Amino acid sequence: MGTMLNDFRFGIRMLLKNPAFTAVAVLSLALGIGANTAIFQLLNAVRLKTLPVRNAQELAQVGLRASDLQLTRGSKGLLRYAPMTNPLWEQIRDRQLGFAGMAAWGMAGFNLAQGGEVRPARGLWVSGDFFNVLGVQPELGRVFNQSDDQRGCTAPGVVISHGFWQSEFGGSSDVVGRKVTLSDRQLQVIGVTPPGFFGLEVGKSFDVALPICADAMFSGANQRLDSGTNWWLMVTGRLKPGWTIAQANSQVSTISAPLFQQTLPSNYPAASVNDYLNSKLEVVDGSSGYSILRDNYERPLWLLLAIAGLVLLITCANLANLLLARASTREREIAVRQAVGASRFRIVRQLLVETILLAAIGTSLGLVLAQALGTFLVASIGTTRDVVFLDVAPDLRVLGFTASVAVLTCIVFGLTPALRATRVSPGAAMKVAGRGLTAGRERFSLRRGLVVIQVALSLVLVASALLFSRSLNKLLKLDAGFNQENLLIARVGFNRLKIDPANRLAFRGQVLERIKATPGVKDVSEMDSIPLTGGGRGNAVWLEGRTSADKVDASFNRVGADYFKTLDIPLVSGRSFSTTDSRSSTNVAIINQTLAQMLREPNPVGKRFVVEATPGEGETTYEIVGMARDAKFEDLRESALPVVYLASFQDAYPSSGRQFLIRSNLPPTNLSASINQGLREFNPGLDVNLQVFRSMVEESLLRERLMAKLSGSFGVLALVLASIGLYGLLSYGVTSRSKEIGIRMALGAGTRNVLSLILHEAVLLVLIGVAVGVPVVLYVSRFAKSLLFDLSPTDPVSLVIAGLVLMSVALVAGYLPARRATKVDPLVALRDE
């Protein structure tokens, strides 16, 4: 133990003796380990962690079999997890055998009136046993039980989250019994959840939870408790002791047929009845909860972790090179220690202790850096409207990962230099007096090999950064089929005004006219779905006179008369909508070019098409009055989708809110305040939210931005590390070859010849590194294929640019040592020898 302590003391002295070396080594390690830890923390939170509830491994999800997800086609989007209807949930709860308890939940949105202002609140509908099934105990008060979730509940309590308690009530201990106003209804707080509980959807949190029975109170005639066509509840259960997921799945599958038979809605379309009755339920692991965020980011995060791992390998190669150079200058010291009896093991241990000290300091700083970077990463995948909630605090898994990385780093960059430094015999080392015997043993030394590895790995990182950056740039510059500039989105809610459904269309028209009257507004239109932001209703259509066998799945958007004018989408034929297209006139529609092609009708204006019946609406026929040019509808990445545009004035079920698309003559940000003020003056009861359209589009590219930013940062870091390694190697080479350079200059070699000699070695090393790296790039880039847009993972342009960048780095890194070589005095060099 005493000798080990002496080794640590000596190691500390040696590191302090070489502050420049120590600073470079520690900073490199901190960046490499910090980046890896930060990305692993995020991956851990999104994918690896189980839910923060009691015995999460006992939880399972119950849902529709993947092939039956079309049953929920009331909306068109990326929802992977199909929800249930309330009647179906109640039947599952009452007839299953494999679960000790079951819970249902669904997302909700409320208008929170607190502190004199109205703002959105994130809500959960939960069954009475929700918290008990999960084993969540309240921080204060109590949580719901079965008696709280009974049909006809008129004064339900509300359970609030820990975060909501802190932000809205300042963590007051007397919060239980106080009131919150949600969508104009006052509810009493009965409890507060613990700080670590966010619900069952990873990446989201909630503010308030209400029992499912309260839906009738908030939704009135549109309540969903008895509806067999509203799919809105997720189902989770806790397995009974001794039951496995496979056994529970078998039992639930067995009862699927009678469950769907019993819950078949009386108004279900005849064409879809068989699909409904043949559906099956399945049980899958629920320990990690639900997560759309996970579906979107799991693959990118694994890829980023691999990229960060390459950065760490470059760091290790760089540090190994530095340690080899340092060891060569300590050969005389090591020789003396061997001569006086120190064993090779003892010297290797001493050198490894110095490596361990570097790794320990670098890892400690890396953990600090990881926390800051982790917070940045979470913020990078969320927006002000869609805040991401993830706990990236280090747990045992993260600490274990970091410790493993630190140990491997020690082995990779510390062991080889230590073993190599002790291979030289004391006599030989004493003769050369520390002038680099080890470095001169082979022409293509280990240090040159390490630089080649750095260059090869840097090529992979730089090429990856170019691929992701160019992919993002293509998306940002893509022609969406309409003018995206100077557009503003206004979301206007008038639920608080309690306007009768019969008067909502007229009121929406008044709101539109008020917006249009705002100075600076050029055009304005209402709409159901905002372009390029996902979602929207979908259904099947076919031309009248043909059969449903010719049907085409299309997206729908109900829009105002000036929609196409506002977006600068030209009509290829026919007319736009007008105010005369009312509920008392013929149903009219405008279709896009793609739908016309899929319907095999080059001149669709004047033709009629049929919309397939849904559980909420029978078959409907529309007359085509216009054909619009194709424009991106749901997503920038999509190919042209078949789209049906319906007239807003013919909306049979107008909602208590509307979205308006505004074309401005001014910068949109300058117009927001005027529109907001005008609408408040028009009616103070309106809930208004405004956002620049272009910023919404950019928010839809958060994943692509994250990949471009991080891969670009890692690419730059790799270039810096590679240039340091190359510079260090060439500088040491100039020092160790001073005699050779002196002789060359004595024999007539000029400055250009010496420059060429050193730069030739730099270029040669980079060329070899690029040659090694190209096949690696071609192999690994295929894993990024699904994350690229309109770009091949083997894109030759990106590869060539990456090679040229590395060549430029080689010339820059080699120039200073080459210039120093030209300053060698032949007489001094020869006399020193």
Kindly give the residue locations of the regions a language model identified:
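"Rare, low-scoring activations can occur
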Residues: 189-199, 216-294, 511-524, 593-594, ...
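Structured, solvent-exposed hinge/loop segments at the ends of secondary-structure elements
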Residues: 36-176, 181-188, 196, 228-231, ...
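Internal alpha-helical transmembrane segments of multipass membrane proteins
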Residues: 23, 27-31, 298-322, 708-728, ...
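Short, strongly hydrophobic transmembrane alpha-helices
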Residues: 18-46, 50-52, 315-316, 359-363, ...
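Small-residue-rich transmembrane alpha-helices
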Residues: 39-42, 282, 320, 356-429, ...
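Membrane-helix entry/capping segments
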Residues: 1-21, 53, 117-120, 151-153, ...
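Alpha-helical transmembrane segments of integral membrane proteins
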Residues: 1-22, 289-293, 322-349, 353, ...
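Interfacial "coupling" helices/loops that link adjacent transmembrane helices in transporter permeases
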Residues: 315-359, 725-763, 770, 783, ...
